[in-house]
Every structure is written in C-alpha cells, then in structure tokens.
Amino acid sequence: SLTEEDRMKSLEIVKSLIASYKKPLFLAGDMNAEPESDFIKELQKDFQILSNPEKHTYPAPDPKETIDYIAASKQNATGFAVISARVVNEPMASDHRPILVELRTAEKADKIFRTKPYLQNPVGNGITVMWETTVPSYCWVEYGTDTTRLERARMIVDGQVVCNNKLHKIRIDGLQPGQKYYYRVCSQEMLLYQAYKKVFGNTAQSTFSEFTLPVADTESFTAIVFNDLHQHTNTFRTLCKQIQDVKYDFVVFNGDCVDDPVDHEQATTFISELTEGVYGDHIPIFFMRGNHEIRNAYSIGLRDHFDYVGDKTYASFNWGDTRIVMLDCGEDKPDDHWVYYGLNDFTQLRNEQVDFLKKELSAKEFKKAKKRVLIHHIPLYGNYEKNLCANLWTKLLEKAPFNISLNAHTHKYAYHPKGELGNNYPVIIGGGYKMDSATVMILEKKNDELRIKV
C-alpha cells in the first residue's frame, strides 16, 4: 500500500482475520511506514513488533529508513520467545535490507517430559526425585500426605533456583518415616532466560505417585539386586518378569548395568528402561558403579543422573534395623594400565574408603544393627583375578560381622559359604547378561531372619 489510507484499510482486513487463528500469527514485509507513523501505532494495538525498528532497512545500499517489519499477533503471542532480531548486512540482493528474527516456539505440554520421575537417596528423612525434560524447564515437586493439600519443593543452590536445564534433581527433606506421601513433578518450559527477562511456555504435570520412607525400627523389608545387565534390555525385562509377584521396598543396581555410556541420550534411554522396569516412580533405587560405568565418553556425565547417598559412590545407611554398606571398587586394572591413558586415580578412591570403613565399622549405627549387608561390584572373594581393593580392605572386613556380601562382575553365579575362601561372611556373586546366566537377587529380611533368593 503506497498511501496511508490504503494501509489503514489493509490493516482492517488483517485484523478481521485474526480472531479465527488459534496459533501464533505473524505479519512480515515492507509496510511502507516508519515506526512513528500512525499506521505502525495502529498496528501495535493488535501486533507486537518483533524486529528491531531502530535498525534501518531502506534503501539497501545505505539504509536511512525503517519500513520493513516482522510482527506477531498479540492474541496468540505467548507460544514463543524472541531469541534475536537483526537486519542482515546484504546491500545487493534487493532494494531493502533483509530482516531476521529468531524465535523459539513453545513445546506442547504433553511433549515436555522426556522420562518418568524416579526416586533416589531415601535416607535421612528425605528422598530425591529425578526426571528429565525434552526442553529447558523450571521445575518443582508437589507433595503431601494427600493430593488435596500439597507443598512445593524446588532445587535451590546458594539462594538460586536451579532451572533452565533438562535433567532435574529435587530433594524433599523433613519427611516422616512410615508416612505415605503422594507427589507429582511439574515442569514449565523456559523459552528465554536472560538477565532481565524470562519467558515461560507450557507446564506439564505428571500423574501422582507415592512413596513411604522406612521407620527406624522396621524389622522387615524386601530388596531387589540386579547386576551386569550391560544394557541388555531383553535380559532385564525377562528378569523383571521373574519378580513381578514380589513386593519390594527398594532396588539396587550393583554395577555394569549402564555400561560404557557413549552420550547423554544413550544413558537416558537405558536408565529410563531400568527405572520404569522396577517402578522407580514409587520404589527408590540405588545405582552403584561397576568398572564399566567408568568407561567411555559419557562416564563422568553419568553421575548427573543419580543422587548418591552422601554424594559419594560409596555409602552406608539403615533400612530399618538393617545396615547396608556399599563400596566402590573402581576399575579392575591398575591405574597405570595403558588403556586408561593416565586419566584414572582409583588408588585414591580406594584409600578414601579405608577411612570410611574404619569409621563405619566403629559407628553406633553399624554396631547396633540387627543385620548387616555388604554390597560391592567386584568380589573380594571368588573373583577370577585379585581385587585391587583386597590389600586395603580385606584386613578391615575379615572380622567385620556382615551377614552377607552381594557381588557381581564375574558374569557367573556363585555362592561361597562363610570360610570357604577365607571369607568371614557368606558371599553371593550374581550372573551375567546372557539369558542362560543372568540372575536377579531377592534380599528379604523378616524379623531376625535374612534370606537371599537368586
């Protein structure tokens, strides 16, 4: 339109069409009007200018005026954010300079969740909820003893809410052991995160799940222990069928389950397989490292997917009147082996655990426990080669009153009664990932009796 009158009539036609559009509507082109004109002022009543009117667009060789615009209807202007807006330095292609606006559109609410939530670290009257989204998000957990009166938990570090990320870890503390809690996770997409401007998209809410922390004096529980799955989905699903009628309280993955992680996507895919397979949205899971979790390009990144007890890959905690001690053996070859390229120092990690074991074995919680369970990936007894931890740990453990040690790594099921190999406690070693050798352990504590079924 070359005249103001024609432009105004054209604008009326455009406005009459807006009401029928439910999605974001954009208007772009040569409007033959400068920013202070009556036409642009009238346009801005219903449209938001997305391009930068302070940058001239015409004539292309030496711009003196701004007459080209990209605008969005205000009626549906919440489904996107402007990332950048600029005039392209191109004086020859046309008599107008091209203008470019980069937008980020909002994801649909039902596409925001990448994974279901899974529970971690159910100790110290608290629990951690983790999940992943497909887009950067601001997240929180809504929880309570019933679904009509909910509190909100967020991840706050040094006074700042952790957000604008895809992998989410939120701790809920101050919980009452023995009390059933209901919770759901909420994720609101963050379309723009700038110093002085934030733009939010749609919000996704999960369905409600539930969990219950064990009371301090509980005498009965059931735990499931997997090992050496090596990302074999069919093996894992077959083992899950073996325990489908078992009601269990927590799950342990005793190493080499998420083995040799290549990248984030691969790790997320199999972790989701594991957590969903054991109903990790309401049954807490402990992930332990084997030597294969330490290998490949994403091995360091794998840590972000878990919430370790005490923020260490080794730990101890009580489940009722039973003490659980978990150790991390590290790699199965010396640090100076050529395959590690000088990038490992598991000698230091093993020595740290010497101090940890000394404190643990003399701790009140350990001494007062009715039963004591030791779990680590590489066996100290019954391994096909010497465990690199043996010289450091054996003397501490040979008199420790553990009732059982649950191990893995050899890919061959074995049971070694107390004393058979100089072991001060019975040792059970889980099988491998092949269908004919795979095992799953059921650890059952009833009153004063501790049973293991493999």
Located regions from the model:
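Active-site environment of divalent metal-dependent phosphoester hydrolases
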Residues: 2-4, 31-38, 59-65, 231-236, ...
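Conserved, compact domain cores that house catalytic/ligand-binding motifs in diverse enzymes
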Residues: 219-297
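Conserved beta-sheet core of the metallophosphoesterase superfamily
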Residues: 40-63, 67-72, 167-168, 384-448
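Active-site regions of metal-assisted phosphoester/phosphodiester hydrolases
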Residues: 1-109, 191-193
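Extended active-site neighborhood of metal-dependent phosphoesterases/phosphodiesterases
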Residues: 186-210, 265-362, 392-401, 414-433, ...
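His/acidic metal-ligating clusters that form di-metal
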Residues: 4-41, 137-139, 246-250, 278-284, ...
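Acidic/histidine-rich helix-loop elements
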Residues: 2-6, 150-162, 190-202, 222-237, ...
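Acidic, histidine-bearing metal-coordination/catalytic regions of metal-dependent phosphoesterases
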Residues: 76, 95-97, 102-225, 244-246, ...
